């Protein structure tokens, strides 16, 4: 695998047209700032796409699935088999994310990044398997560095296919029993925080299970401390196959100047790694919502992110990212279609 396939050339967005963009927003038939966060969202999209017509084309939801060795220790209310069952549910159209994607006209793709046993006999699952579940991170590395590189390369090919098809917005969701443990460990390692500030109740575990989860994540961080010399090494030691591929896909999408809609705690952990690898990724990220997982707010603050929604969600699957899509479309539509004061013959209030 060539090194060129693993590096990402991501341009920072240009702020040269900010005055033009902001004036266009301010001269719409409304008081300045009256559309709140939709105005800052329109500015962000216009920085990426240019100050003329904004476009949301072929928006696509990517749900990355993988299993985690640590799940065998009972860190979730559900066993690892549920990952397989939910991936099958996605393929058959029965999950919350399927319902929301149908309602909103979002294309949905489900990627098997490495669940314990693949779903067979069902169409609609993309095979990008890196293994049959990761290593148990409190006992061994999750995967090798070569595996991280392979995951990034697969993710780049996935994004390239969508880019070539004309898609300019990708939303990120995930499924993997045990992945809040992995995400919390990644957060603690990169942000240099106490584990207790990062580990939460995930699927709704009780206090006894939470204490066990906390101990195992602390053990994982201690075990791999000397090996975690950079963000890719953090992924190799602590990550999930789905977190690795989300990270690579976010890097690839930013490289192609696509809008990247980030879902909840696990997707934000992938975004944290992506931004640590290349800070320019941050310009392309739209954070959909603040989840109930306790570490999520800290990660959002670290990334200087203001999420669009706060609905008390803790499901994952990309559900929050899907629900944010109409707001992103509304930001583009008001920018494109709303009359200016001069167009409407109204006295300006700027």
Swiss-Prot record:
The keyword Glycosyltransferase applies. It comes from the Bacteria. The active site is at residue 317. It catalyses: 5,6-dimethylbenzimidazole + nicotinate beta-D-ribonucleotide = alpha-ribazole 5'-phosphate + nicotinate + H(+). GO terms for molecular function: nicotinate-nucleotide-dimethylbenzimidazole phosphoribosyltransferase activity. Signal peptide: none annotated. Pfam families: DBI_PRT. Pathway: Nucleoside biosynthesis; alpha-ribazole biosynthesis; alpha-ribazole from 5,6-dimethylbenzimidazole: step 1/2. Its EC number is 2.4.2.21. GO terms for biological process: cobalamin biosynthetic process. The keyword Coiled coil does not apply. Keywords: Cobalamin biosynthesis, Glycosyltransferase, Transferase. SUPFAM superfamilies: Nicotinate mononucleotide:5,6-dimethylbenzimidazole phosphoribosyltransferase (CobT). Belongs to the CobT family. This is Nicotinate-nucleotide--dimethylbenzimidazole phosphoribosyltransferase.
